[in-house]
UniProtKB/Swiss-Prot annotation:
It is a multi-pass membrane protein. Belongs to the tetraspanin (TM4SF) family. GO terms for cellular component: cell junction; cytoplasm; extracellular exosome; intracellular membrane-bounded organelle; lysosomal membrane; membrane; nucleoplasm; perinuclear region of cytoplasm. Residues 1-11, 74-88, 233-241 are cytoplasmic. Glycans are attached at residues 141, 154, 178, 184. Structural component of specialized membrane microdomains known as tetraspanin-enriched microdomains (TERMs), which act as platforms for receptor clustering and signaling. Participates thereby in diverse biological functions such as cell signal transduction, adhesion, migration and protein trafficking. Regulates neuronal differentiation in response to NGF by facilitating NGF-mediated activation of NTRK1/TRKA receptor tyrosine kinase and subsequent downstream signaling pathways. Plays a role in the inhibition of TNFalpha-induced apoptosis. This is Tetraspanin-1. GO terms for biological process: protein stabilization.
Amino acid sequence: MQCFSFIKTMMILFNLLIFLCGAALLAVGIWVSIDGASFLKIFGPLSSSAMQFVNVGYFLIAAGVVVFALGFLGCYGAKTESKCALVTFFFILLLIFIAEVAAAVVALVYTTMAEHFLTLLVVPAIKKDYGSQEDFTQVWNTTMKGLKCCGFTNYTDFEDSPYFKENSAFPPFCCNDNVTNTANETCTKQKAHDQKVEGCFNQLLYDIRTNAVTVGGVAAGIGGLELAAMIVSMYLYCNLQ
């Protein structure tokens, strides 16, 4: 009986934390959707660039609703000893776990296909908007500076772009000695070709593989928590009168 009470208490506390996290995500999502201007003032140009591609507000609202509902079900089910709430909590968490595993398998098996698909989408966008659309250009500059990469595939992605047409040169990130913006020479086609700076997609894959232990540890930790929560919910379900 003491073991049951202890596990029940831990289940309530754990899901209360999840519930509060969901409420926070939901609140931020509503804030961004209703008053995006003040959000941009606080978080600066990078948030504006991100919102160019993904509606952050709606994404946070959706994520917040799921996490909020999950935390509520787990907390309510454990507190009131409701079998219906506990089994619903279990199946929602199971679906999330299966989706995560499926996404990981797809990412591992279809990396080449994903690269080809993204190339068809991203490269034309670079050629069309880099150098003319401020937010789009800022996103790529931030990405290339952070990952120390050039374009999606390589420097050729910027050929015929507004930036190239205006400057007759490639972004400084495409030449190694220009990454810190300290070099006086422009990044010409010959120089970019000689430097062979890696494309951002391959660089991202390289960084993930280099930090595979950390990435795997985080993924395993999240998966472990989800499995533990499912086991505990089933334990409570089976031991309720």
